[in-house]
Amino acid sequence: MPLPRYKQINTDVTPYYHCISRCVRQSYLCCRDARTGINYEHRRKWIQDRLHKLSQAFAIDLCAYAVMHNHIHVVLHIAKGRAEGWTMDEVLLRWRMFYKCPPVVQRYLENFDSVTLDELAELKSLSVIYRERLQSISWFMRMLNEYIARRANKEDECKGYFWERRFKSQAILDEKALASVMAYVDLNPIRAKIATTLGNSHHTSIQYRLNAKRSNKTPKFLMPFSDSHYKSTVPLPFAFSDYLQLITDTLNAERNNDTCITPKLPNRLLSKLGMTKENWQLVTSNFETLFTGPVGCPEMMENFARCCQRACRPNVANAQRYLS
């Protein structure tokens, strides 16, 4: 039986989560249909655009994403403190980007002085609900999946499920796990042979970051790295230059069929993480196989299980072997 979401997500322990949504029956609903010949590749752009829009409205940052032909990967960061700093008006305006609000909210947003004291109390009550939702991964994924499903069904002139009923989520508990899952996501299209380089890996965060880098711009919709010039938000705990070198070395090693990466120069990120080249290669190639639940060092996994009241501690042996 699937675990309830409160046993999978706990922002008091970690703000980072890896989420996966798969198309029903693992059908390829975002590429060329082999039976009809119809190309649905444009749906990947729908998903990417929706992710960007959601990241603008939610107190949730996009660390990494990859839109595949029959599933999506996203690595998310919950910026809980950011949501708490929004005014009531900001919360209502952000929620209205996606849903039609009650008449009292619509009237208030059209004329901020046209409400009674009772209506103002109702607005404050609604803003509390909306604020909580705007920092919820469940609502983030719901607004992503529901929108894409409706649009795809309209295009196909049919009804029914587009996605599997529940998305999978993994708590990412430390820097080793975070760097590993981001690399796993960014390299996924190349390993699936739907791209050949990081630059032509379409509808991925790494391509978006590289395009921004070439234009000397900051990726607008993504969580910045620590070496970014954009300092208005909490950055990822490592530099993009080090991360890019590491995943490039990883990719080159795989192409040469090496058992571990052999960079020309020592990689600062790998040294900072304290991981061996062999363990890095293994974890970033088999992340979902090695870890089916929360990911991190054994101590962090034990703490997460205790805080979330989970009796089972899956994959502790793998964490001990590869991430300790």
What are these regions (language model features)?
Residues M1-S324:
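Short catalytic/metal-binding and nucleic-acid-binding patches
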